[in-house]
């Protein structure tokens, strides 16, 4: 791979053959969800960890069988922190600060607690959370009791499973994202340290957007259609201001992309990101919850070099026609379950549109979305099915559970 790609990040399409991907192994963080708190952590039900791991392993094996190299976010962070005691201590302090621990005694106990763990176990524990009962000798303040969690000193991070969102690969660079929900913001510390300190990634990876921005941006809303064209969703989790900031950064730094299409979709739990209702699966084929244009308002952002300003216009054409125009080819859109009112809504809810392309016309999909998967195959798409009785409880499909790092150029 080093011979083929000079940069550790190489994403210039959604469908080029996938060569390298970032995942997270489901861990004990899922066991720390309870019925009372699961909604706060963006889960609609409690996954059974044993089966979730089995389902995820099927996903991993399909990727490996198709010669995809797999990196794990927890491994990369551990490698960074194992390289320097000073860096490990800095990370611990930042992690505790961003967990909003305010009492000095609790801060000091947590620093000792994490410092005495091996790096691997420390990272795992930071993700799974630290329960109050684990710090038996800790004296909590009134503020800790009143404003903190009754169960955890450090909350679990079950959404680390969805590696698509905390950062996103665009061209040879990345966005380290400002997450919309407070419960997910600590996830991006991992990306910050990987791309600032890891020997494989700290060089030659420009950062187009950073985690301290005021407006939110999440990877489920970021799409690279080709070397000229991006699509960014404006959704429940990504704000319009972030699209403008990202565009300004890309144009200022002379990234190759000349046009950004901003797709505004309804702010709705079922459509939290654009990739829950829309993905590309072949050169000329997309899947969408619906082709009804009431769901999409489209804006075009381009750069005017003469005025040094970003031009923004509202696109009046329909979704299919907009895609056809900017991609220069006729486009087909396969609707979830063919647009059936019952099956379409059910399968979109279970991530029928959230498939991961591993090559042009070849995707990984949840097996439960049988109507949509059959339509894919009838339209010449090769479908690799994975079980999802537990993985789907977090409302994320194969694209959500993966961040593409390297794809073949097309």
Curated annotation (Swiss-Prot):
The keyword DNA-binding does not apply. Pathway: Amino-acid degradation; L-arginine degradation via ADI pathway; carbamoyl phosphate from L-arginine: step 1/2. Its main location: cytoplasm. One of its GO terms (molecular function) is arginine deiminase activity. Keywords: Arginine metabolism, Cytoplasm, Hydrolase. Pfam families: ADI. GO terms for cellular component: cytoplasm. Its EC number is 3.5.3.6. It is an enzyme of class 3 (hydrolase). The active site is at residue 400. The keyword Cytoplasm applies. It catalyses: L-arginine + H2O = L-citrulline + NH4(+). GO terms for biological process: arginine catabolic process to ornithine; arginine deiminase pathway. It is found in: Cytoplasm. PANTHER family: ARGININE DEIMINASE. Belongs to the arginine deiminase family. This is Arginine deiminase. It comes from Borreliella burgdorferi (strain ATCC 35210 / DSM 4680 / CIP 102532 / B31) (Borrelia burgdorferi).
């Amino acid at each position: 791979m080093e011979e083929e790609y000079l940069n550790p990040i190489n994403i210039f399409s959604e469908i080029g053959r996938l060569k390298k991907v970032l995942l997270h192994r489901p861990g004990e963080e899922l066991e720390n969800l309870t019925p009372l708190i699961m909604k706060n952590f963006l889960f609609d039900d409690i996954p059974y960890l044993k089966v979730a791991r089995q389902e995820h392993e099927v996903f991993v094996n399909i990727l490996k069988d198709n010669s995809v190299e797999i990196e794990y976010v927890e491994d990369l962070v551990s490698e960074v922190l194992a390289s320097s005691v000073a860096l490990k201590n800095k990370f611990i302090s930042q992690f505790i600060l961003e967990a909003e621990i305010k009492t000095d005694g609790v801060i000091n106990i947590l620093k000792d607690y994490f410092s005495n763990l091996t790096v691997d176990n420390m990272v795992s524990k930071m993700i799974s959370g630290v329960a109050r009962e684990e710090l038996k000798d800790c004296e909590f303040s009134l503020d800790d009791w009143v404003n903190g969690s009754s169960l955890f000193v450090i909350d679990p991070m079950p959404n680390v499973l969805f590696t698509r969102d905390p950062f996103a690969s665009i061209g040879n660079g990345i966005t380290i994202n400002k997450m919309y929900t407070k419960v997910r913001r600590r996830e991006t510390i991992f990306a910050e340290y990987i791309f600032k300190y890891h020997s494989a990634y700290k060089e030659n990876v420009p950062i187009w957007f950073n985690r301290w921005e005021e407006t939110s941006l999440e990877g489920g809303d970021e799409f690279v259609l080709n070397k000229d064209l991006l699509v960014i969703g404006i959704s429940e989790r990504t704000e319009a201001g972030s699209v403008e900031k990202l565009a300004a950064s890309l144009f200022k730094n002379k990234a190759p992309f000349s046009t950004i299409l901003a797709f505004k979709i309804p702010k709705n739990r079922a459509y939290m990101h654009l990739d829950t209702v829309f993905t590309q699966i072949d050169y000329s084929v997309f899947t969408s919850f619906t082709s009804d244009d009431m769901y999409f308002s489209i804006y075009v952002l381009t750069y005017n070099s003469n005025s040094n300003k970003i031009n923004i216009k509202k696109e009046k054409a329909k979704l299919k026609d907009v895609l056809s125009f900017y991609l220069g080819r006729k486009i087909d859109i396969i609707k979830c379950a063919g647009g059936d009112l019952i099956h379409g809504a059910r399968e979109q809810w279970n991530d029928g549109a959230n498939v991961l392309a591993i090559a042009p016309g070849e995707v990984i999909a949840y097996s439960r979305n049988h109507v949509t998967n059959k339509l894919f195959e009838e339209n010449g798409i090769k479908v690799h099915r994975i079980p999802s009785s537990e993985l789907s409880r977090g409302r994320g499909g194969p694209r959500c559970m993966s961040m593409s790092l390297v794809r073949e150029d097309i």
